[in-house]
Regions:
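C-terminal segments of enzyme domains that contribute to small-molecule binding surfaces
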Residues: 2-8, 71-75, 79-80, 97, ...
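Short acidic/polar alpha-helix capping motifs at helix-coil junctions
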Residues: 1-2, 20
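Conserved protein kinase catalytic core
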Residues: 117-118, 136
């Protein structure tokens, strides 16, 4: 569902899927082909939130406080992305937390359950793991391609949901 807040309503691009029980609130922009899955919350109630093209915000994830999400990004189930910048072609693993001022550069993976502390910047092609999160190694070309493939699979899945989902 989309909600206006303080006179600001979400801006939604073409071919966007928003699950019925997801909440997209206030000053939010969703790029073409993006998807917001069941139970997710994108709260643009205090600052603008940007979600790029063909990005997916998976079940029960939360975006808040000026988060900027690039193109082709996967934000995994139950992740929290707060006041940070996630560049293009990044996978934020399930249950991970990325805090204010952090920057995750393109072609990177933040592993499941990682805690990215505030104001940390990570270089491109990083495998970022742990609590607190650190770079463990550079990603391979195959791993980078798998990030792209995951985002594309969610674009396809969102199209299927838009065509075939029936509310009972």
């Amino acid at each position: 569902m989309k909600y206006e807040f303080n006179g600001k309503a979400p801006e939604v691009g073409e071919n966007v899927f928003i699950a019925d029980n997801a909440a997209v609130i206030g000053d939010v922009s969703l790029g073409d082909g993006s998807s917001v899955w069941f139970g997710a919350a994108i709260r643009g109630d205090d600052m603008h939130i940007e979600v790029g093209k063909r990005s997916n915000i998976q079940d029960n994830a939360t975006l808040h406080s000026g988060a900027v999400i690039g193109d082709g990004v996967t934000v995994g189930h139950n992740a929290i992305v707060h006041g940070c910048r996630i560049c293009d072609n990044v996978l934020i693993g399930m249950g991970s937390i990325v805090l204010d001022g952090a920057v995750i550069a393109e072609d990177s993976i933040v592993g499941a359950g990682a805690l990215v502390t505030g104001n940390k910047t990570f270089p491109p092609k990083s495998l970022i793991l742990g609590s607190p999160a650190t770079v463990r190694r550079e990603l391979t070309d195959e791993e980078i391609e798998s990030i792209r493939n995951n985002a594309e699979e969610y674009v396809k899945l969102s199209i299927e949901y838009k065509k075939t989902q029936v509310t009972l």
